[in-house]
């Protein structure tokens, strides 16, 4: 069961496997999922919510793969009690999240949202209202040095920030 769109390369791999029958659903509402899981061996899920109520209907289920890094939308305790593994794409988006973090840091330092709004309104004189902070040589503290934090650090060093 593939609940939502995944990258075309991933779908091509699944389609190319002769022993795999792909089941797709148009809706990810609980009733649709409850029916869809009844005869599947595996589930690939992005954001659909798989509660114990839905998963108990999956009598043949052998694995759930989360197409992403978290699994808050899957009742992992229920699956663990049944001996069914849950796979995640650990670290797959760490660089993207790190780049996004860096972008938000720069936007915040430059008060970019307020500046942009003023320009779009034609309020050119407002530029003096917003304080911008120079970040070159700034000291940066990274709270949490997991997959994402480890990617943020070298990006900060590129900007001559002190960690």
PLM regions and their residue ranges:
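Rossmann-fold NAD(P)-dependent oxidoreductase module
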Residues: 13, 100, 104, 151, ...
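N-terminal glycine-/charge-rich "phosphate-binding" loop or analogous flexible N-terminal tail
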Residues: 1-40, 160
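Generic structural signal for small/hydrophobic residues in well-ordered secondary structure
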Residues: 14, 43, 64, 79, ...
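Short gly/ser/thr-rich secondary-structure transition/capping motifs
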Residues: 22-28, 45-46, 119-128
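Structural motif corresponding to alpha-helix initiation and N-cap regions
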Residues: 8, 27-34, 48-52, 73, ...
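A short, aliphatic-rich alpha-helical micro-motif
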Residues: 36-37, 55-58, 135
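Phosphate/diphosphate ligand-binding glycine-rich loop within oxidoreductases
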Residues: 41-120
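Rossmann-like dinucleotide/phosphate-binding beta-alpha-beta segment
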Residues: 129-163
């Amino acid at each position: 069961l593939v609940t939502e769109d995944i990258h075309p390369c991933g779908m091509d791999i699944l389609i190319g496997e002769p022993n795999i029958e792909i089941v797709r659903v148009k809706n990810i509402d609980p009733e649709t999922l409850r029916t869809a899981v009844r005869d599947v061996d595996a589930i690939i899920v992005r954001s659909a919510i798989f509660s114990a109520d839905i998963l108990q209907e999956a009598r043949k289920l052998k694995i759930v793969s989360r197409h992403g890094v978290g699994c808050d939308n899957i009742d992992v305790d229920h699956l663990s009690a049944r001996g069914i593994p849950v796979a995640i794409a650990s670290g797959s988006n760490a660089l993207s999240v790190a780049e996004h973090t860096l972008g938000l840091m720069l936007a915040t330092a430059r008060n970019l949202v307020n500046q942009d709004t003023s320009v779009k309104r034609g309020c050119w004189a407002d530029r003096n209202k917003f304080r911008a902070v120079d970040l070159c040589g700034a000291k940066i503290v990274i709270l949490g040095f997991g997959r994402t934090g480890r990617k943020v650090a070298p990006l900060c060093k590129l900007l001559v920030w002190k960690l």
